[in-house]
Amino acid sequence: MTQRRRRRRARRGRFGRRAFLAGAGCAALAGAAVLLGRGQTASASSVPPTDEAEPNAALPSGEWRAVWVSYLEWAGMDFSSEEAFRAGAAELMDNCLSIGLNTVIAQVRPFGDALYRSTLFPWSHLCTGEQGQDPGFDPLDVLITEAHSRGLSLEAWVNPYRLRSSAKMPPALAENNLVNVHPEWVCAVGEGLYLNPAIPEAADYVVQGVAELVQNYAVDGIHFDDYFYPTTDAALDAAQFAASGAGDLAAWRRQNVTALVKAAHDAVKAADATLRFGVSPQGNPDNDLGQQYSDVKAWLAAEGENAVVDYLCPQIYWGCGYTLQSVSY
């Protein structure tokens, strides 16, 4: 057992077990979220959970108070040296502690890249300004050290399919970006570039990236964002759909996404059953189901060997009085 893993195991002992909990989340310290544990359901008016549900070793026993730290925040960090980045990371973690948080969800693969040493993905342009260029230190290792030294949990946040959000983000792609290595896996939606969710080899590669993270870093979990199918356009995966022989496009697409999420969950648990695997879907499950082909209710209900997620953290960016989004999980 590595020193990092021993340190993470010792710290995790302070959390305990429960299958359902509610907590606050925020993106750039704004917005709210409800955390739903596997096998449970909740609505905007949910009462505090009972202890009747079967315990889930991956979930804390108390509140899960988390913050999303996105690539937008990394753009404001100093990556010029390990010392400079560590100073910024220390300030970030101190700020999290000062407002009562206990978990940091750090975006480490925003564009098919890596803010860590990877054999699968190029270095993120956020580190040096150029995708593929080694910054000379490991930002994720620094983040983990600074978080754990303060008793904070750190989850690695991965965007599974997105490779480029526009022609300028990232500004240029490395030679070993999947756009260049496996162009047959890539689909374009507007100016964005994405892995095609209908191609199993592409999904397998994403899962390999998850395994690389949990095997090599003392993270406390893996967190997927809501970037699943990038469009409802039937042309996106028409060739794969025709070859599949499936009869219903929407159901088939949901199967593709669920297969990826399930495989990622299993890769996390294969490394350590106490690690968390969660997804942050859109706050409206109807949109998840019909627009991004993410059957989040089924994921939440699945248990045992069929488990898909430990938790969902819906992106609920509205108040209880906003009736257009008053839907329940």
Residue ranges, per PLM feature:
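Active-site-adjacent "subsite" loops/lids of carbohydrate-active enzymes
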Residues: 62-64, 68-83, 161-212
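Glycine-rich, aromatic-flanked loop segments that form ligand/cofactor-binding clefts
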Residues: 66, 101-109, 139-186, 223
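Catalytic domains of carbohydrate-active enzymes, especially glycoside hydrolases
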Residues: 88-113
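Aromatic-lined substrate-binding rim segments of carbohydrate-active enzymes
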Residues: 110-158, 252-260
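Aromatic- and acidic-residue-enriched segments that line the glycan-binding/catalytic groove
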Residues: 116-128, 162-189, 227-245
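Aromatic-lined carbohydrate-recognition surfaces of secreted/lumenal glycan-active proteins
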Residues: 155-159, 223-226, 253-290
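Substrate-binding cleft/loops of secretory-pathway carbohydrate-active enzymes
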Residues: 276-313, 318-321
